[in-house]
């Protein structure tokens, strides 16, 4: 029964990925690569009710609103706007506010997902990271983005000082794992999650150092 269950789950996952690809193709929607340039340039306003300090879901919702043309960001925003999941979203949302971590799996692992986490700076700013991946599409390079959130202006500005090149051989074609526990970023080779990852240690500021 376990074998049948796993096969059924795999079929469902692959079907979901095929639907996602078909939706993007049919609608002429952009891939990660299409809106990559804008991600590194666009300032994002973060709106919260009243004077409440911005948190994990506020950063995630602001990002999805800034880039509404992607199937993945649309799906995540719909889920965030429906916290009790009354629409029975079949995808998996992991919310861990105490650790400043969010992950939204569009389909079963490995597949398509968005991760977001943030680090609190001594200045009160937040370093916000967003990672988007599509492990089934070899043409997709994936995205790893960093933003500097200023609580005074309530905006996230792209933080260009951190570049792909700062992460060893870069992130293209590899799997980025943002930290749910701890502070450090791990990068794996695609298709080999059992291999030892490259670890990049947060310097308690706005940079990551290879270990």
Give the residues covered by each predicted segment.
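Short aromatic loop motif centered on NTY/YTY
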Residues: 155-211
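Short, surface-exposed coil-to-beta transition loops
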Residues: 111-114, 128-131, 139-144, 170-172, ...
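Beta-propeller blade termini
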Residues: 115-122, 173-175
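Mid-length scaffold segments of soluble, non-membrane domains
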Residues: 122-159
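Bacterial N-terminal signal peptides
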Residues: 9-19
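Positively charged n-region of N-terminal signal peptides that target proteins for export
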Residues: 1-5
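Terminal domain-start segments
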Residues: 26-119
């Amino acid at each position: 029964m376990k074998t049948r269950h796993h096969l059924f789950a795999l079929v469902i996952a692959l079907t979901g990925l095929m639907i996602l690809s078909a939706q993007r193709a049919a609608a002429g929607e952009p891939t990660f690569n299409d809106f990559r340039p804008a991600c590194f340039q666009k300032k994002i306003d973060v709106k919260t009710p009243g004077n409440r300090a911005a948190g994990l879901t506020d950063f995630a919702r602001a990002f999805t609103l800034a880039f509404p043309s992607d199937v993945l960001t649309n799906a995540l925003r719909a889920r965030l706007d429906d916290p009790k999941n009354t629409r029975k979203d079949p995808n998996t949302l992991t919310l861990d506010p105490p650790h400043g971590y969010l992950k939204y799996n569009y389909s079963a692992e490995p597949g398509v997902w968005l991760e977001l986490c943030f680090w609190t700076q001594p200045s009160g700013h937040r370093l916000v990271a967003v990672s988007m991946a599509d492990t089934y599409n070899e043409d997709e390079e994936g995205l790893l983005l960093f933003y500097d959130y200023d609580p005074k202006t309530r905006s996230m500005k792209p933080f260009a000082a951190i570049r792909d090149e700062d992460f060893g051989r870069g992130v293209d074609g590899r799997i980025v794992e943002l930290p749910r526990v701890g502070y450090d970023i791990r990068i794996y080779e695609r298709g080999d999650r059992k291999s030892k990852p490259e670890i990049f240690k947060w310097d308690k500021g706005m940079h990551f150092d290879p270990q």
